Amino acid sequence: EQLIRKDVXHXEXFAXXS
């Protein structure tokens, strides 16, 4: 579960940052 949460956070950060 924690791994998935990290993936989601990364994705959000990427979109934002991008």
Swiss-Prot record:
Tissue note: Expressed by the venom gland.
Any single GO CC term annotated in Swiss-Prot or TrEMBL for this entry: extracellular region
Compartment annotation: Secreted
GO MF annotation terms: toxin activity
Keyword Ribosomal protein: no
Primary location class: secreted
Keywords: Neurotoxin, Secreted, Toxin
Keyword Manganese found: no
Family of this protein: Belongs to the scolopendra toxin 3 family.
Protein name: Scolopendra 5920.47 Da toxin
